[in-house]
Curated annotation (Swiss-Prot):
One of its GO terms (cellular component) is plasma membrane. The chain crosses the membrane at residues 2-22. Residues 57-66 have a biased composition (Polar residues). It is found in: Cell membrane. Keywords: Cell membrane, Membrane, Transmembrane, Transmembrane helix. It is a single-pass membrane protein. Residues 57-79 are annotated as: Disordered. This is UPF0154 protein lwe1321.
Length: 79
């Protein structure tokens, strides 16, 4: 009787751990393919702040954000 409870708890924990890692991998690939901010969103944000965004300024900000994301990736891998 107690073996069934023990096996059930072990299976539950294994399912939770497996589900967590599968969901984490899915979300990381989703965010890599669909970044949370794009040029149109950046242009809209700048317009809301009262700035008239030029394409050069938008490209500079996008490249700065991409560099920041690339810079953070190695830090996360080391942990």
């Amino acid at each position: 009787m107690w073996i069934y409870i023990l096996v059930g708890i072990i299976c539950l924990l294994a399912g939770l751990a497996g589900g967590f890692f599968i969901a984490r991998r899915y979300m990381m690939s989703y965010l890599k393919n669909n970044p949370p901010i794009n040029e149109q969103m950046l242009q809209m944000m700048m317009a809301q702040m009262g700035q008239k965004p030029s394409q050069k300024k938008i490209n500079q900000m996008m490249s700065a954000m991409n560099k920041q994301q690339e810079k953070e990736k190695p830090k996360k891998a080391k942990k």
